[in-house]
């Protein structure tokens, strides 16, 4: 008989999978609507939201995919050696952790840029308005935000995760394990 904790964990794993399955087409639909409708192409806020839709399209694949895989697949196996997707390889450890930090920070700052663009569009007497409301400037600022936070989080991609060798005392076999978020320099990004 399953305990209440196992049932709740399974439910949350299923919920994470549903978020991925529903969030992906919803964000793609948002991107399509923001890019294809003619009145939206020159609106600064909508331009930033189109970039935000693409960034938020990838966010569930970092957090929810890891959780859903752990709760729905890895816990059902008899021999559990891997508990998270991040433990599969050093590349997945680095990629998932980098993506998680980069995408969330990038989404937050794109929302800030959209809020500022909306504020500028409402204040007609600001001198910055004539420059800031040009669609090419907004596209460049959006790309600059994405590139800037990609570079800011680059040390996570470089220094996070390490591969260690352990000897299993019961079987006397050597095992290679991936430890994510274990670097001594990682504390600066938390």
Which positions does each model-derived feature cover?
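Membrane-interfacial loop-to-transmembrane alpha-helix junctions, especially the N-terminal start
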Residues: 43-47
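Class A (rhodopsin-like) GPCR signature focused on the TM5-ICL3 interface and adjacent 7TM helical core
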Residues: 22-32, 110-124, 155-167
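First transmembrane helix
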Residues: 8-38
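Loop architecture of class A 7-transmembrane GPCRs
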Residues: 1, 73-102, 130, 151-190
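Extracellular TM2-ECL1-early TM3 structural module of rhodopsin-like
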Residues: 5-17, 51, 55-113
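Hydrophobic alpha-helical transmembrane segments of polytopic
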Residues: 12, 16-19, 48-55, 138-145, ...
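Class A GPCR helix-loop hinge within the 7TM core
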Residues: 102-141
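Membrane-embedded alpha-helices of multi-pass membrane proteins, especially ion channels
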Residues: 27-34, 60-67, 149-157
């Amino acid at each position: 008989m399953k305990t209440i904790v196992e049932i709740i964990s399974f439910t949350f794993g299923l919920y994470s999978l549903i978020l991925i399955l529903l969030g992906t087409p919803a964000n793609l639909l948002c991107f399509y609507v923001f890019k294809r409708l003619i009145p939206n192409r020159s609106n600064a806020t909508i331009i930033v939201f189109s970039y935000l839709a693409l960034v938020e399209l990838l966010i569930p694949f970092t957090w929810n995919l890891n959780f859903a895989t752990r709760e729905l697949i890895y816990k059902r196996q008899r021999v559990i050696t891997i508990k998270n997707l991040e433990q599969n390889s050093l590349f997945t450890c680095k990629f998932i952790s980098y993506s998680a930090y980069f995408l969330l920070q990038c989404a937050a700052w794109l929302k800030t840029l959209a809020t500022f663009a909306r504020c500028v569009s409402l204040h007609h007497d600001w001198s910055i308005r004539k420059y800031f409301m040009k669609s090419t400037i907004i596209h460049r600022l959006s790309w600059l935000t994405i590139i800037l936070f990609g570079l800011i989080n680059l040390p996570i991609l470089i220094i996070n995760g390490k591969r260690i060798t352990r000897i299993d005392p019961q079987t006397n076999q050597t095992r290679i394990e991936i430890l994510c978020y274990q670097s001594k320099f990682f504390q600066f990004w938390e």
